[in-house]
Amino acid sequence: MANLMMRLPISLRSFSVSASSSNGSPPVIGGSSGGVGPMIVELPLEKIRRPLMRTRSNDQNKVKELMDSIRQIGLQVPIDVIEVDGTYYGFSGCHRYEAHQKLGLPTIRCKIRKGTKETLRHHLR
């Protein structure tokens, strides 16, 4: 496996990665802000509910291009997920999510924001 060097903006240089806890929580990438704001987490695909999936269809050419890209360089942009009462709802990244499914990947990188039921209702309008 090759080593990868990247230049990060100063605002991202304080991020750290930690392994999953003994209770099976997913690995977390977070800032030094004490848990305020979104977290980047690898979540199992089956833990993410996709409430808008039935109302939209994905461009299969875009899904194929993303599959090729993910195979070569991995997922570059996490999908956005809202956590409400311990349940994860995905509202962006439909093509990236489907590409992960078709590749048989068990997890996907997510940017998680905590939300309320009212936030969830707002996204479903």
Swiss-Prot record:
EC annotation from Swiss-Prot or TrEMBL: 1.8.98.2
Keyword Transit peptide in record: yes
Domain of life (superkingdom): Eukaryota
Transit peptide: 1-22
Catalytic reaction equation(s): S-hydroxy-S-oxy-L-cysteinyl-[peroxiredoxin] + [protein]-dithiol + ATP = S-hydroxy-L-cysteinyl-[peroxiredoxin] + [protein]-disulfide + ADP + phosphate
Cellular component GO terms held in the UniProt record: chloroplast; mitochondrion
Protein family: Belongs to the sulfiredoxin family.
PANTHER family named in the record: PTHR21348, SULFIREDOXIN-1
Record function comment: Contributes to oxidative stress resistance by reducing cysteine-sulfinic acid formed under exposure to oxidants in a peroxiredoxin. May catalyze the reduction in a multi-step process by acting both as a specific phosphotransferase and a thioltransferase. Required to switch on the antioxidant pathway to regenerate the oxidative damage. In mitochondrion, catalyzes the retroreduction of the inactive sulfinic form of atypical Prx IIF using thioredoxin as reducing agent.
Name this polypeptide is given: Sulfiredoxin, chloroplastic/mitochondrial
Organism: Arabidopsis thaliana (Mouse-ear cress)
